[in-house]
Amino acid sequence: LAGLAAFRWNEITRMTEICWKDREEGFRPMTDRDEGTLWSRINKQQKPMRFADLRLVLGSEFVPVYHPFKAYFYGLPRWQEGDADYIKQLAETVTLADASPEARNTFCHCLKKWLVAMVAGFLTDRVNHEILVLIGKQGIYKTTWFHFLLPPELRNYYVAKNNSRRMNKDDRLLMAEAGLICLEEIVTMTDEEVDQIKAAVSLPQVVERAAYARNKEVRPHLASFCGTGNQVKFLTDLTGNRRWLP
């Protein structure tokens, strides 16, 4: 097997990924066709092997564990005192209704707290309890701004959700498999939907059985939440709006 391809088990997606040694491509999720090709090549080039045995090996410690977020962030150069304030530069890409320096500083402060909490959620067992919301008219690239927050290496872990009416099993699993979940047009959410989102944001873990899995798993809550809308007064909860940063 090692002579044919490299393998890794994605701790977030719970999928085995493959990188063929005779192809000019990187790692990608393994497909049924990949398994069939491996089995065929092994039987042609070496000695006969049962297909069931191949699957047992690919599901064992033979395949090393890979955490995409830890691999990315721990591979970055360490920020040093005197380096550019990249979060401040990012904050300046957002046009504020209030152009005063005080409003700009407040937004930069909130953005920094939210981003730090998001990265902490990627690397530790901490959970980001706040939801950053961009409010403005349609067509000004609010959702696009959130989409490009994740670097290209992690962009597959961004999910845009435009129907928040039901927090079902798949949505809960997303909290363990996505890095950033964007709630589009949050103004359409009812009070019940807002309560569901607030409860989901604070969950420390996700306990669900994934499709085709035999048992339930306790998985860390990885995802941070963000949202977009076109009305400032989108919340009607009189008990407080602590989780939202509009």
Residue ranges and their predicted role:
Residues 1-85, 89, 96, 101-106:
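N-terminal nucleic-acid engagement/recognition segments and initiation subdomains in replication
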Residues 60-177:
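P-loop NTPase catalytic core of nucleic-acid-dependent motor ATPases
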Residues 145-148, 192-200, 243:
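Alpha-helical scaffold elements adjacent to nucleotide-binding pockets in ATP/GTP-utilizing enzyme cores
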Residues 171-176, 210-228:
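AAA+/SF3 P-loop NTPase mechanochemical coupling elements
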Residues 184-186:
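Walker B catalytic acidic pair
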Residues 189-195, 237-238:
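Conserved ATPase-coupling elements of RecA-like P-loop NTPase cores
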Residues 194-217:
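Conserved catalytic/switch belt of AAA+ P-loop NTPases
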Residues 235-246:
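A short helix-turn-beta junction within AAA+ P-loop NTPase domains corresponding to the substrate/partner-engaging
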